[in-house]
Structures are given as structure tokens and as C-alpha cells.
Amino acid sequence: MMVWEFIDDVGELMNDTGTRTILDLTGKTITTYILFEVHDALADCCEGDRVEAITDAVTAIDNDLHAWSRTTGNSLVEVSEHGTTRRYVIAKSAPKHSEHKLAGIISDDGLFELLSPLGFALGAALEGHDVSLYFQGPAVRVLATGFRARMHGLGRPFSRFPRDGLAKVGHIPPQDKLRQLQHLGASLFACGPSMEHYKVDPANLAFSNVTIAAYLTFMEQMSSADIHLVA
């Protein structure tokens, strides 16, 4: 009989063969947040090691975790429901090479307008696809040190309230998502003329390894990509 024992308060479970990392992700409904935490935990594991993720029992989360498992090859060896929560046991598999590439163009720096393009980019990167993002127009401000996403229009002064609500469910700030993307190997590009127009100083970027260019440089990325995203 397998005997499990909690060995500390930070989420590790021990049996007679080693440890299993446990991630309590209840309250988070954004699957890119959930899967980035799972990805990070698996990165420290050997092939065959397991990570346990506890989430809310939400259909969208369940479908996305199964899609991620099919794409990456990491196995969902056990899924069980317990009231309002669902427990996923994930076994790390050998890395699965992806032939897909996403090239995305982002033109808007609004709080809600950034959610979808960054979400799809993160989803692609978490599935192991090559990701390149080009920021143009007002979106170049997203790359500047100190940027905080705000709503457009009359709601702009009250942006803190939806921003806090989004963060609570897993929509972390845009710059944090970009750091996750770079951690996953994504490449960032910025439109040089837009940076000049919106007074974004290249010396004041919040990210390293940003390629400052214009249309033709990013056309190289788009021509080799099979997934295109324009937002």
C-alpha cells in the first residue's frame, strides 16, 4: 500500500519513492496562470516524476489541461473531483518538439485589450511552440519600465479595481506575462517609429533582448510562422 505523508507546509508530499510537488491553485481560473505554475514545477522534476495540481472544478480548466497534456506529452495520470475542486496528477514526460510557430502583432495597450493576445501567446509558449511578438502603436508602452495597464475612456481613473479583480483570478499584469513568455523562450520585437512617436526610450525598456525594428524585420518572423495573431 502506498503511504503518503505531508512533510512541510509548502506543498510537497512524500512516499516511499520520493516527493511529489502539490500546487494549490484554487481560486485561479485563468489556465495560463495554472499551467505556468505546473510548467515551473515540472522543470525541477525528472522524467516520470509527478506534480499534483488542485484547481476549481471548472470545465474550461479541465479542457485546457487535457489539451496541454495532449500537446506536450506530459501525462494526466489521475483526475478526480472533490466537491468544488478537481485534483490533477501530472507525470513529466520527455520533451516533445513542436513544429509550430506563433507570430503576433499587438497594437493596443488597454487593460482588457491586452488579455487575449497575451493569453494566446502564453498558451502557445506553454504548449512548446515558438512565439514572437511585435509591439507597435501605443502598445510599445507595454515594454517601458513602470507601465501599468489601464482601461480606455471614462473608466481610466478607476482601472485599479478591475486590475485587482483580474489579478485575483490569475490575470497577472501584462509585464509579468511578458516575463513568463521570455522565460518560456519567446522573442519580443518593438516598432522603432512607434517608440519615437510615443516617447518610449530604448534605454528605459523593462525587458532585455527586445529587437527594435519595423515591418520587414517582423515579416521574416511571420513568413516562417503557421499561427498568426493580430490584436
What are the functions of these language-model segments?
Residues 1-85:
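Ordered, small/hydrophobic-rich secondary-structure cores
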Residues 25-32, 103-115:
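Short, glycine-rich nucleotide/cofactor-binding loops
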Residues 38-39, 115-127:
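Histidine-anchored nucleotide/phosphate-binding helix
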Residues 53-55, 131-137, 189-192:
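Short internal beta-strands
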Residues 72-80, 151-182:
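A glycine-rich helix N-cap at a beta->alpha junction
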Residues 87-95:
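Core SAM-dependent methyltransferase catalytic element
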Residues 130, 137-138, 142-144, 148-161, ...:
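Positively charged, small/polar-rich N-terminal and surface patches that mediate targeting and assembly
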Residues 174-230:
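A charged, amphipathic interaction segment
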